Structures are given as C-alpha cells and as structure tokens.
C-alpha cells in the first residue's frame, strides 16, 4: 500500500515540477521541446536558446523569472533534447557536446556556460 502511495505521489510531483513522467513517451531529438516540458529542460541546461525570448539582442528567460536579463551572446547555445525511457539527453552547439542524465534524477549542466553570461544592465534614462 505504501509503495502504491509513493508511486502516485511521485507522479504528482512530476506534474507539479514539470518533469517528464516515465510514461510520457519518447521525445525524439528536437530543438523545440513541448512547451509544457520547458520547465524541466531549461532548469538543467539554462543556456539552451529555446529557453530564452530575445529581442534586439536582449534576452529574458522563459521559465525562470529570477534569472537576470542577458545580452545575447555565445552563452546561448543551440540545443537539441531527447528522451528515451528514463534517459534525457542534451546535444549542444555545433561541436555536438552531449549531456546525458536520468530523467528521474536530473543533474544540472549550467556551470560551464554561466562563465560566458553577460548580464544586461539598463542605463539610467
């Protein structure tokens, strides 16, 4: 009984936090993941271009309101994401760097990219 309860609780947590459920099916490699999964994909690889709305070189994160506005530069990278059973994978940039993780136990891959982030600071008008 406890196992069933914990299983149901886990599925509910996945829905609340935007994590892809194990039974969500496979996601073939795409540069435009489903809108309802952006919360998951953009948390663990926030430099992906699909996580940002950019206009005139200034970008705002689509998912995380606490992220600062940034200047569009090499920090943003083209990413393709895919899911096969419990394996979630990011394929980033032209060099095709891969980051693979268990979807149920995700690991952020943000640190190496944050070094290139340029925060936008408004000048006083």
Curated annotation (Swiss-Prot):
One of its GO terms (cellular component) is membrane. It holds the Pfam family v110. It comes from the Viruses. Keywords: Glycoprotein, Host membrane, Membrane, Transmembrane, Transmembrane helix. This is Protein MGF 110-3L. Residues 1-6 are cytoplasmic. The chain crosses the membrane at residues 7-27. It is found in: Host membrane. It is a single-pass membrane protein. Residues 28-116 are extracellular. Plays a role in virus cell tropism, and may be required for efficient virus replication in macrophages. Glycans are attached at residue 64. It comes from African swine fever virus (isolate Pig/Kenya/KEN-50/1950) (ASFV). Its main location: host cell. Belongs to the asfivirus MGF 110 family.
